[in-house]
């Protein structure tokens, strides 16, 4: 399904994949899987390879492949969060020879390790607890904690009081980004009070996100009944229990809840499964520029009587419903790889279709601190104005620096297989020291060398490094990368909501409002890439992931190209989403190919099928180059149709976005009701929240992969087949490794069954299943909307053409351009 694995040919950034699968399991014959394979997303429904010619001469990723010192975490190309290998171009070969001969290279490993500043801190203010029944607890905590006498500061601020620009200014005040925090952030969700719940049977749980890593709590350990009169007593009790010195924080938090009766029905188990009829919301087919913030109506109390009842209960002196006072004591640990990152804590009700109960956003400033902690009540906030939210949540966080510099496969426990592809596999893994869940892609060096894809593989990693260093909220982040003599490893955020393809396949199509939300976030992601001179080139549902809250994250940069200042000629992509200029224009194409794919994607989301789908690739290319787009009645609003037509203009110079890139798309009337700043900060409630029972939930991924056994991955067995590559070949991967290369030999025996278990899956093209489409007679042919300046609509291009493509066997795609057009 997902294209997490890409296989490209020799010295071109090429690829061509058609990875959709018909819901009934039928193969439509579109066997032109671009750069073959699926090595770059999570699950992979298809893997097929075929080399493609290109007019590029191999001068790819020059700024990246010449990098000589490699960071252990994806912070930037020259700012290191966990130390470097320090491999230089002059001694790379010697280093690799030493590695294979078991010779230590400690000196080189430490040559470029950045200095860690560990300024000591007066711990008196770090562990203070501020109890406040009103909404001023956060401000009070800031006033109390900000001590001018401390040599370092720990500042906690709320979203409402600190804008993005202000946060950036505050970050600059704390020093340059060369002092990136390296440590662990332990977060304990203790309890909440005065929640607005629908009934005493409500089952609150928490989704906690930090640097795109997710934690999904179980249900409460117990539910307590409290009086408002006792709030101050509770605050005093927490103040008495505060930990002023970090060295004394060994108290077991679970003991504090032993006196509560466990009447919640949770019994310490995972979240209960939701009945099937609660998972599906009615599909409506037409809404013109409606407010997205009204989509949360199912996530708030809509009955006025219930609202008044719940609101009044918040100020009464009587006892609360048990469900309004959940006690969790759930603890999780996050890897701190960046600086000034946001800690997002959202509360939901599993018993009422994951109703939203409130949110807290914190910005723990831990710059240059060896230790820091805080133990405090925070007022829950709504995401939008009309959400009914009240109550407070008690949160404790503790930050500690770590000394570890190098990571390898032994630091991760494999949990589930998420996908397979040409180069290797993608696994759900758990980092052993923090228990954090990640996705780990394992690529076989032998296959990469055989397909001559070393430069592209390193280029993909460096694009991920670039996007991580200039973070976008809607792009999957790279956390770690390292290598052994046999394999390459990329460790990224695990998005538990699964891929958008999986949800689209199950539901058939989305409402216009839901599609608009996803497209708007994709516009921000593509704008971020284009502003950094990166063309994505493989936009499709398989490469779009959902997080636990329902926001999207773009993944799979296997076909992306960096440093694109003008045009490129590489023939790559997925058939249904290819732009016509990629087929027809011998002068190459620009970043506008991404916006064409975006137009195809929104059409597919709303209508339920691809606008250019055909039973074979030759007909599909003809439709892309010359076919008319047909809209079913009452599926897209007039603004939506105008937006799609603007994106599907065959002349890239007149396509929507050609003048001002993503900013031009954001100004379109289709997005008139979007608050872009709020969307960028993820303040707009997603129209759909994935149903999850834990942070390790894989129910939104293909069970064909997730049910496969991975027990052999965690066993250290002798090497069965392949031997390490020669030192000369190993040296070619010097720009990839993040692990201490003197320790690579000890990992050589861990991962040799990957190639044995790899396989090629049958390719196909996906049409969402049974979306209750309108009858044929309701299809509208928009004949009058052709662009008179569109020079690509000339049917004469079809004259005297003959096929130059082989549609059998390995699906080789010949991208020879003849007389300004692709031979169809």
Curated annotation (Swiss-Prot):
PANTHER family: RIBOSOMAL PROTEIN S6 KINASE. InterPro entries: AGC-kinase_C, C2_dom, C2_domain_sf, Kinase-like_dom_sf, Pkinase_C, Prot_kinase_dom, Protein_kinase_ATP_BS, Ser/Thr_kinase_AS. The modification Phosphothreonine is found at residues 570, 723, 737. Activated by cAMP. Belongs to the protein kinase superfamily. AGC Ser/Thr protein kinase family. cAMP subfamily. Residues 1-23, 249-272, 286-302 have a biased composition (Polar residues). Its EC number is 2.7.11.1. ATP binds at residues 418-426, 441. Coiled coil: none annotated. GO terms for molecular function: ATP binding; protein serine kinase activity; protein serine/threonine kinase activity. CDD domains: STKc_Sck1_like, YPK1_N_like. This is Serine/threonine-protein kinase SCH9. Residues 672-748 form the AGC-kinase C-terminal domain. The modification Phosphoserine is found at residues 711, 726, 758, 765. Residues 412-671 form the Protein kinase domain. Signal peptide: none annotated. Residues 24-37, 226-248, 307-321 have a biased composition (Low complexity). The keyword Transferase applies. Disruption phenotype: Sensitive to high hydrostatic pressure (mechanical stress); simultaneous disruption of RRD1 exacerbates the effect. The lineage of its organism: Eukaryota, Fungi, Dikarya, Ascomycota, Saccharomycotina. Residues 1-37, 125-152, 221-272, 285-327 are annotated as: Disordered. It catalyses: L-seryl-[protein] + ATP = O-phospho-L-seryl-[protein] + ADP + H(+); L-threonyl-[protein] + ATP = O-phospho-L-threonyl-[protein] + ADP + H(+). Protein kinase that is part of growth control pathway which is at least partially redundant with the cAMP pathway. Regulates both BCY1 phosphorylation and MPK1 activity. Regulates ribosome biogenesis, translation initiation, and entry into stationary phase in a TORC1-dependent manner. Phosphorylated by TORC1 in nutrient-replete conditions and during mechanical stress. It comes from Saccharomyces cerevisiae (strain ATCC 204508 / S288c) (Baker's yeast).
């Amino acid at each position: 399904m997902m294209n997490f694995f890409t296989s490209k040919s020799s010295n071109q950034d090429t690829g061509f994949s058609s990875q959709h699968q018909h819901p009934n399991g039928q193969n439509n014959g579109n066997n032109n899987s671009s750069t073959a394979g699926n090595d770059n997303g999570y699950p992979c429904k298809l893997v097929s390879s075929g080399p493609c010619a290109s007019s590029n001469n191999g001068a790819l990723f020059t700024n990246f492949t010449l990098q000589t010192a490699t960071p252990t975490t994806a912070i930037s190309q020259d700012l290191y969060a966990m130390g470097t290998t320090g491999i230089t171009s002059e001694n790379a070969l010697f280093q690799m020879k030493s590695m294979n001969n078991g010779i230590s290279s400690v000196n080189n490993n430490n040559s470029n390790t950045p200095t860690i500043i560990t300024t000591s801190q007066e711990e008196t203010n770090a562990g203070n607890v501020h109890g406040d029944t009103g909404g001023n607890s956060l401000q009070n905590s800031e006033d109390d904690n900000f001590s001018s006498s401390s040599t370092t500061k720990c500042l906690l601020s709320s979203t409402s009081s600190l804008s993005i620009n202000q946060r950036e200014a505050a970050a600059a005040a704390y020093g340059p980004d060369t002092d990136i925090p390296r440590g662990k952030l332990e977060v304990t969700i203790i309890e909440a009070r005065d929640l607005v719940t629908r009934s005493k049977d409500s089952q609150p749980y928490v989704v906690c996100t930090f640097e795109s890593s997710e934690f999904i709590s179980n249900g409460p350990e117990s539910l307590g009944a409290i009086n408002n009169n006792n709030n101050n007593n509770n605050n005093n009790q927490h103040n008495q229990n505060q930990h002023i010195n970090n060295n004394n924080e060994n108290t077991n938090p679970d003991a504090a809840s032993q006196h509560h009766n466990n009447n919640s029905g949770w019994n310490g188990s995972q979240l209960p499964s939701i009945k099937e009829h609660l998972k599906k919301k009615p599909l409506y087919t037409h809404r013109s520029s409606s407010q997205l913030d009204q989509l949360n109506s199912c996530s708030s109390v809509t009955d006025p009587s219930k609202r008044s009842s719940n609101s009044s209960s918040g100020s009464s002196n009587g006892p609360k419903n048990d469900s309004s006072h959940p006690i969790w004591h759930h603890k999780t640990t996050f890897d701190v790889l960046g600086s000034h990152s946001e800690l997002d804590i959202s509360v939901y009700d599993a018993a009422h279709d994951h109703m939203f109960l409130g949110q807290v956003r914190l910005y723990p400033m831990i710059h240059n601190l060896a230790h820091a902690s805080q133990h405090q009540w925070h007022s829950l906030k709504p995401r939008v104005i009309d959400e009914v939210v009240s109550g407070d949540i008690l949160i404790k966080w503790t930050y500690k620096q770590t000394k570890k510099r190098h990571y390898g496969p032994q630091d991760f426990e494999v949990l589930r297989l998420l996908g397979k592809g040409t180069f290797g596999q993608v696994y759900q893994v758990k980092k052993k020291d923090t228990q954090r869940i990640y996705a780990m892609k394992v690529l076989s060096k032998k296959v990469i060398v055989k397909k001559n894809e070393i430069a592209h593989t390193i280029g993909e990693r460096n694009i991920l490094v670039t996007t991580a260093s200039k973070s976008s909220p809607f792009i999957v982040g790279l956390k770690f990368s390292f290598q052994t003599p046999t394999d390459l490893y990329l460790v990224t955020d695990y998005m538990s909501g699964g891929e958008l393809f999986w949800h689209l396949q199950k539901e058939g199509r989305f409402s216009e409002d839901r599609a608009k939300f996803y497209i708007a976030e994709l516009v921000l992601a593509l704008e971020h890439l284009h502003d950094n001179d990166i063309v994505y080139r493989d936009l499709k549902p398989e490469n779009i992931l959902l997080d636990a809250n329902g926001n999207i994250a773009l993944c799979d940069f296997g076909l992306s190209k960096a440093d694109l200042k003008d045009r490129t000629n590489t023939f790559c992509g997925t058939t249904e989403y290819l732009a016509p200029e990629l087929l027809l224009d011998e002068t190459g194409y620009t970043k506008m190919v991404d916006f064409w794919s975006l137009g195809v994607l929104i059409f597919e989301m709303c209508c339920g099928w691809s606008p250019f789908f055909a039973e074979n690739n030759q007909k599909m290319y003809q439709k892309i180059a010359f076919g008319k787009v047909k809209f079913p009645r009452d599926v897209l609003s007039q603004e939506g149709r105008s937006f799609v037509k603007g994106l599907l203009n065959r002349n890239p110079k007149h396509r929507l976005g050609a003048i001002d890139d993503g900013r031009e798309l954001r100004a379109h009337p289709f997005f008139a009701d979007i608050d872009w700043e709020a969307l960028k900060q993820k303040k707009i409630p997603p129209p759909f929240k994935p149903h999850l029972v834990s942070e390790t939930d894989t129910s939104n991924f293909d069970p064909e992969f997730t049910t496969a056994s991975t027990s052999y991955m965690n066993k250290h067995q002798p090497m069965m087949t392949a031997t390490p590559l020669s030192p000369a070949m190993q040296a070619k991967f010097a720009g990839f490794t993040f692990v201490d290369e003197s320790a690579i030999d000890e990992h050589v025996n861990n991962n040799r069954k990957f190639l044995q278990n790899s396989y090629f899956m049958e390719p196909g093209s996906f049409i969402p299943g049974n979306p209750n489409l309108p009858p044929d007679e309701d299809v509208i042919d928009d004949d009058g909307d052709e662009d008179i300046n569109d020079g690509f609509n000339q049917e004469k291009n079809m004259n005297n053409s003959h096929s130059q493509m082989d549609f059998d066997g390995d699906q080789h795609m010949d991208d020879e351009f003849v007389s300004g057009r692709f031979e169809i």
